[in-house]
Amino acid sequence: MSQVCDICGKGPQTGNNVSHAHNKTKRRFMPNLQKVRTQLPSGEVKSIKACTRCIRSGAVVKPVAKKAVS
């Protein structure tokens, strides 16, 4: 499963775990991705993976909720 934001392209970064003895082992810092339904400019509603920064900045347009038929 790809860990890349569909809007900004943010992906995993590499770094080190550092123990108290200063031993270093490689690790990956993953972006905080959320699966969210968004409305594309064409009007189509699609589910994408977006990082929380894109969601908070307003780059993700939430679709208008459908009204229940009664």
UniProtKB/Swiss-Prot annotation:
GO terms for biological process: translation. The keyword Zinc does not apply. InterPro entries: Bacterial_rp_bL28, Ribosomal_bL28, Ribosomal_bL28/bL31-like_sf, Ribosomal_bL28_bact-type, Ribosomal_bL28_sf. GO terms for cellular component: ribonucleoprotein complex; ribosome. This is Large ribosomal subunit protein bL28. It comes from Maridesulfovibrio salexigens (strain ATCC 14822 / DSM 2638 / NCIMB 8403 / VKM B-1763) (Desulfovibrio salexigens). It comes from the Bacteria. Pfam families: Ribosomal_L28. GO terms for molecular function: structural constituent of ribosome. HAMAP family: Ribosomal_bL28. SUPFAM superfamilies: L28p-like. Belongs to the bacterial ribosomal protein bL28 family. The gene is rpmB. Keywords: Ribonucleoprotein, Ribosomal protein.
